[in-house]
């Protein structure tokens, strides 16, 4: 946390020759401090929540590209299941009435049965009863805090947090001292060892799907991640899904149309996965905005349209967004942030970019958060 200068009483900093900050640790020291803290925290989580971590690893689910966007829930899923079941019954009747040895009729019946099973799977992907939300409208809240704080302050019921994670590296260099939304999630939970356990089946396979930094909507759904803050332990599901990086994709000769489709597909996948898994509160950031290159208005419009077309599919949505995007989200959703004590904010350093997965200085800090 940035320190207040007690010498001049104005929140300034002591300066040396050339205006150099004499009190601020340099960048390497900051990163090394975070690296040590990451190692300590990971060891603590393994010791305290070993059994729960193993269960989360076992129960995690990978949604292949396009699978999340095809999920159904509630009345939509029930209707699809009824149609598929009726088709299966008709095909079975036709097969029974066909002559013996009519392989074509038998094959049609088998296909229809498979369709019915697929519809049931889409309706309830993990076999969890009562997964369909019952709300008829979606309530939206906009906050300028990181996702873990939003979990403690603003979430109700079964909660899913969106981790805009690194596509090919578990935790996005968390263990090396990187800093960003994903690393913050890892630093307050047992998420990191879960991600590492899925390196081979999720992250390594993602290397074939980078697509000029647009990536895909291939996602890792982790149920019941444990968050710990001051002895208060909370559970939340975490969806690891990469943000498309429009800025780099255009440099890699991807078209505007490809960039727009990637963002729309990603948001569709996020909300459908949340709804199909019975999420009551979805916590998501300004997905795709900032240095990823998408205008905040474009992101907001896609989310607004989805919510309008599926009211109540996700009963509560909390946007945990940086200050620079907060006004746009509040204006769009009419959701003022609850009043909280005004923090003392110290100006941030300008930093360079270290790459897609570990550029911790890319982070647009929420209100009241500063770096040391």
Feature annotation, model-predicted:
Residues 2-372:
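Macrodomain-like recognition of ADP-ribose-binding/processing modules
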């Amino acid at each position: 946390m940035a320190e207040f200068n007690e010498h001049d009483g104005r929140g300034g900093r002591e300066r040396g020759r050339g205006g150099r900050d004499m009190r601020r640790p340099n960048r390497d020291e900051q990163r090394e401090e975070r690296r040590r803290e990451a190692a300590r925290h990971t060891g603590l989580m393994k010791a305290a929540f070993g059994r729960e971590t193993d269960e989360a690893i076992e129960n995690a689910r990978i949604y292949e590209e396009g699978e999340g966007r095809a999920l159904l829930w509630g009345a939509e899923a029930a209707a699809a299941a009824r149609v598929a079941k009726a088709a299966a019954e008709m095909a079975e009747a036709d097969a029974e009435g066909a002559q013996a040895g009519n392989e074509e009729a038998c094959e049609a019946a088998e296909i229809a049965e498979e369709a019915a099973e697929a519809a049931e799977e889409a309706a309830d992907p993990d076999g969890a009863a009562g997964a369909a939300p019952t709300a008829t409208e979606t309530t939206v809240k906009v906050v300028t805090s990181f996702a873990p704080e939003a979990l403690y302050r603003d979430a109700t019921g079964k909660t899913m947090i969106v981790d805009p994670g690194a596509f090919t590296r578990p935790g996005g260099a968390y263990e090396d001292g990187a800093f960003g939304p994903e690393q913050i999630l890892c630093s307050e939970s047992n998420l990191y060892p879960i991600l590492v356990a899925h390196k081979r089946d999720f992250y390594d396979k993602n290397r074939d799907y980078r697509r000029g930094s647009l990536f895909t909507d291939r996602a890792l759904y982790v149920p019941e991640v444990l968050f710990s803050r001051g002895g208060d332990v909370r559970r939340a599901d975490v969806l690891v899904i990469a943000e498309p990086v429009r800025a780099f994709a255009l440099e890699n000769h991807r078209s505007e149309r490809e960039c727009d489709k990637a963002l729309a597909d990603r948001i569709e996948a996020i909300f459908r996965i949340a709804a199909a898994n019975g999420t009551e509160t979805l916590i998501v950031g300004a997905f795709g905005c900032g240095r990823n290159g998408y205008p905040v208005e474009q992101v907001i419009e896609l989310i607004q349209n989805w919510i309008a077309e599926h009211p109540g599919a996700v009963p509560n949505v909390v946007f945990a967004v940086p200050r620079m995007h907060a006004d746009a989200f509040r204006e769009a959703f009419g959701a003022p942030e609850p009043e909280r004590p005004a923090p003392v904010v110290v100006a941030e350093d300008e930093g360079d970019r270290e790459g897609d997965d570990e550029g911790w200085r890319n982070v647009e800090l929420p209100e009241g958060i500063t770096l040391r």
